[in-house]
Amino acid sequence: MKRRWKSAVAALAAIAAIGSLTGVTTYAADSVSITNVSYDPTRELYEQYNKIFQKHWKEKTGQDVDITQSHGGSGKQALEVANGLEADVVTLALEYDVDAIQDAGLIDDGWVDEFPEDSSPYTSTIVFLVRKGNPKNIKDWDDLVKKDVGVITPNPKTSGGARWNYLAAWAYAKDKYNGDEDKIKEFIGNLYKNVLVLDTGARGATTSF
């Protein structure tokens, strides 16, 4: 499958329905329960969105819907679902995390074409969170490679959002150095030399900060 990378500064949220939700599709039951398996930083988003969806669904069908949330590193969540974690919906950070679930035979081929925008309902801009008052005057990627700056970011090996962080840094360096790969790699190396903690997910990185 051709990879459809969005922007290097965007977080792909791929969405796929898993299994059969008879109650949802036929509206026969008074209530229905669904589980959304998602990546780390979306917890608060869905806590708010679920209330809107529950109201909408009640008005549309007369059904009450109970939504259970599961959160963690995107790759880890995909592996959990592939290995048996029951999910009705997955909202993950990377296309190939959903592909891993497809490869396990839990969703049909072609999921990426099922909804508009390659099944990417939203994007998330990368921002820098700094100490109060921004004492080191951090404004752009160049500031993160200064020797007196410590960086906290999730591990790209376990976190989908961290991979977008990595790609955003790469895109910045590619533009800055006109595609000179040696200089790009040097920039990325200097950035990760400043990383104090590589947590497994975005929530852990926020806690460490």
Label each residue range with its predicted role.
Residues 49, 53-61, 85, 94, ...:
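Sec/Tat-exported extracytoplasmic proteins
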Residues 32-38, 80, 151-159, 192-196:
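Second-shell loop/turn segments in exported
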Residues 72, 140, 200-201:
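Alpha-helix N-cap recognition
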Residues 43-47, 84, 92, 135, ...:
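Soluble non-cytosolic domains of exported or imported proteins
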Residues 102-175:
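A conserved helix-loop-strand patch within extracytoplasmic ligand-binding domains
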Residues 27-104, 114-115, 207:
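Early extracytoplasmic/lumenal segment of secretory-pathway proteins
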Residues 177-209:
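Ligand-binding pocket segment of bilobal, Venus flytrap-like solute-binding proteins
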Residues 1-33, 55:
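Short, low-complexity disordered leader/linker segments with a strong preference
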